[in-house]
Amino acid sequence: MDWIQCNHCGIKPNQTKLYLTACGHVFCQNCTKAAFNSQCYLCKKPLKVDEINKNLRPDLMELFKDPRQLASDLVNELKQVVAFQAKQREIYVKCKNAEAKKDTERFAEARSKHVEKTQEIEKRKKAFLEDNVKLKNAKEEKNQLMARLKELREQPSQNLSVNKRRSNTRTEPPFSKISRTGPPSVMRKASHEFSLNLRDQSTSKILTSTPLSNIDYSRRDHRNRLFGAGLEHPSPILRQ
């Protein structure tokens, strides 16, 4: 590292000890001790130094590495960082995919339940409408039955009134028939007590449409001619 020397006197590190200040300057041991008020010769900041050797802090040791080696190390480190981040991203994506899959399954399950609930609601709604129709029909049928029952309850009284009117019509004949017919006793008297025994009666008492004057009732041929001859049915008068 020929490029390292004291920034104040120019001495090389192989000739004396060198120190690295906190402000980024390098001074030899003599210059460091002779620093006025312990200030940096260049920037006038307080001197805080670390000896440059193999025991230097790792973060300060990086300042003295070969740039090419440092670049190679940085590339390797960068590769490790990239690989680490890629692996973590892959794991992250897998976790997110698993969560998305679970969410999809939960969504599908919820959707299936929603469809089942919707179908059940529609089924119950249809059953409710059918029950309403049945209830309406039952009410109409009930009203018809109640009307029929009322009609049947009123019908006996109507039949009773009709029968009563018919009974009154039969038991109370018109006054004209009574006046025309008369009681049975009067009718018997009007018949002159006509005897049905034709043998005990003379033919002169029988009413006929033929005049009986100047007729000899004792002649048998006359009676036969009047009541028997030339007729389809024989005379009801018994011959003597």
From Swiss-Prot:
Keywords: Chromosome, DNA recombination, Meiosis, Metal-binding, Zinc, Zinc-finger. GO terms for cellular component: chromosome; synaptonemal complex. Disulfide bonds: none annotated. A zinc finger (RING-type) spans 6-44. Residues 152-189 are annotated as: Disordered. Interacts with zhp-1; the interaction is required for their chromosome association and stability. It is found in: Chromosome. Recruited co-dependently with zhp-1 to the synaptonemal complex between homologous chromosome pairs to regulate the formation and number of crossover events between homologs during meiotic recombination. Together with zhp-1, promotes the accumulation of pro-crossover proteins, including zhp-3 and zhp-4, at a designated crossover site along the recombination intermediate. Limits the number of crossover sites along a recombination intermediate by restricting the association of these pro-crossover proteins with other recombination sites during late prophase. It comes from Caenorhabditis elegans. One of its GO terms (biological process) is reciprocal meiotic recombination. PROSITE patterns: ZF_RING_2 (PS50089). Expressed in the germline. It comes from the Eukaryota. Gene3D superfamilies: Zinc/RING finger domain, C3HC4 (zinc finger). This is Zip homologous protein 2.
